[in-house]
């Protein structure tokens, strides 16, 4: 009987893991997302080539 309960609990855990849907990450109003590409925002300046070439 313990084996049957263990298998049932294992299957229930697997089904719960597949059924889990994470909540969408909604940015808070008034806050801009952190820039990720060069040239966007004050913390991520554009990459400049050296002036000697």
From Swiss-Prot:
Signal sequence range: 1-19
GO biological process, one term: hemolymph coagulation
Main location: secreted
A Pfam entry, by short name: Antimicrobial_5
Keywords, sorted A to Z: Antibiotic, Antimicrobial, Immunity, Innate immunity, Secreted, Signal
Compartments where located: Secreted
InterPro entries associated with the record: Abaecin_antimicrobial_peptide
GO CC annotation terms, alphabetical: extracellular region
Role of this protein: This peptide has bactericidal activity.
Record's protein name: Abaecin
Source organism: Apis mellifera
């Amino acid at each position: 009987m313990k084996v049957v309960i263990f298998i049932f609990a294992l299957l229930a855990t697997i089904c719960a893991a597949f059924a889990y849907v994470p909540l969408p990450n909604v940015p808070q109003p008034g806050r801009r997302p952190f820039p990720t590409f060069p040239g966007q925002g004050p913390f991520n300046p554009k990459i400049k080539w050296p002036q000697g070439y």
